[in-house]
Amino acid sequence: MKRTVGFCILILSVFLIFSCATNNALMKDVYAGYFSIAEEYFKMEKFAKAAEFYEKCLSDNDELTLRNVKYKLAQTYLKLSKWSDASKIYEELLQIDFENTNLKTLLAYSYMKQELFDEAEKIYLSMIESQSLNQSSYKNLILLYGIKNDFEKAETELASYKEKFPLDETIITIETEISNLKKKFEEEQKKAQEEVEKSEDNSEENSESTKNNE
C-alpha cells in the first residue's frame, strides 16, 4: 500500500513537470491524482495524511467531484475526531442535497459529539416526522436523551418505540445502554452528594474547633 502511494506521488510529480495539456485539463488530472493518494491513505487508516490530500482537492470547480471530495473529507474528519469541521461540511452538503437521510444522520452524530444536543435532537425529530418507519432515528434519539442524562424522555421514547416496533429485538441493546447510563449518572450524583456532605461536616468540625480554641 505504501508503494502505491509513493507511485501515485511520483506519477503526479512527473505529470506536473511534463504535461502539455491546457491548464484546466491539467488541474483536473492533478486533483484526480491528489484524490487517489487521499483514498490510499484512507485505506491505510492514515487519516491525517488523507485529510491533507482531500483538502488539496477542494479547489476543483466540478460540482459533482467537489461534493464527493467534501463527503470523503468529512468522513476523514470524523475519524480524526474533528467534529466541528465535519459538521460544517455536512451542513454545506445538505444545502444542496437537503433530503439526504445519510447526511442528516452524520450531521446529527457530529453535533452529538460536540454536545450540541438541541441541534441533534431537531434533526432526529424532523427525520422521524418525515419518515415514521425510520427505526435508526428513533434509536438515535433515545440514545441522545440518555447521553444528555434526560432519562425521563429516554424512557418515554423507549416505551413508544417498543409499541411501534414490537418485533425489533435490537432495541434490547439500546435499553441496556440507557440503563447503564442511568446507573452511572446516579452513582456520580450519589458520589457528588457524599462529597458535599463530607465537606460540610469538615467545615462544621473546623468551626467548632475554632470556637473551642477561643
Question: In which residue ranges do the predicted regions lie?
Answer:
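Short coil turns that delineate tetratricopeptide repeat
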Residues: D62-L64, F98, S132, P166
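Canonical tetratricopeptide repeat
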Residues: K72, L106, N140, I174-E177
